[in-house]
Amino acid sequence: MNKIERVTQALAGGEVDRIPFSFWYHFGLQHMPGRKHAEAEIDFYRAYDLDFLKVMNDYPYPLPRGIRAIENPEDWKRLEPLEASDFCWGEQLTALSIINKAIGEEALFIETIFSPWTTSRKLARSGALAEAREKYPELLLEAMDNIATSLASYAREAIGRGAAGIFLSLGAAAYDQMSEDEYAIWARPFDLKILEAVRDAPFNVLHIHGERIHFDTLLDYPVSAINWSHFRTPPSLKEGRERSGKTVMGGIDEATAYYLSAPEIRKQVSDSIDECGRRNLILAPGCSVPTDTPARNLLEVKLAAEQT
């Protein structure tokens, strides 16, 4: 099997010659042009011979001119819908085009998008988001919808640049962040607006960040695969696959990737396969591996995956 066939079969629940794998980390290139970002991603992909590439997106969401952080109601009002290529998004789209030209015929790649709620939390000064929820909720909901509209437009353009799907990262679908009822008001409609925009893409992934996550209430999201830190929070990898009916991405503990020995890494991978079986499984970390993870450890993950 080639890489595209292997990943496509895993998503479909078919038989694979071996379990496909990938991992990712933050390159910290948000101040560099898209060409430099693309070069780093391509070099990373080739260094570890990944079965697919999850492209990082460290460029910030474009704020209106003159605003460094959202602080007050007037700032929220200025968050109008954006064009997909506005500001530094254009650099990320340039990176996607370069990546597609370099590897698009040999491997799938997906684009990282942070959910509207996660994005709004990054944009606001400390306390401003909670204040908006309490004092002017309608204004905040309108701003959230504008962010979602902008991200949906960007997601469509990313697919147009060759991405096989998006990796939608949810940063608040956890009980220490919101209740499920709160999430249904403040986040869910805006997550779905983005996913609906790229529903036909073959490789959309839902990443549920954090611990004590809202798992079951997200299972109707239109994605092909789900990713979460199952070494840190329920459900287990097997339970998650059974409850979701979707392909699961896991089996590698990002928190221990830094220091495990080669035998320990191989055991972690083999234990995950023994638990979950070979179908509807992609070997991946539950979140980004630390940027300073030694290359030898990542190579051990690659070797362990290639022996499945």
Model-predicted segments: where are they?
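Short, glycine-/small- and polar/acidic-enriched structural segments
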Residues: E74, P81-A84, C88
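Active-site loop segments of alpha/beta catalytic cores
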Residues: M1-H26, D51, V55, S85-T308
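N-terminal capping/small domains of soluble enzymes
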Residues: T8-L11, E15-R78
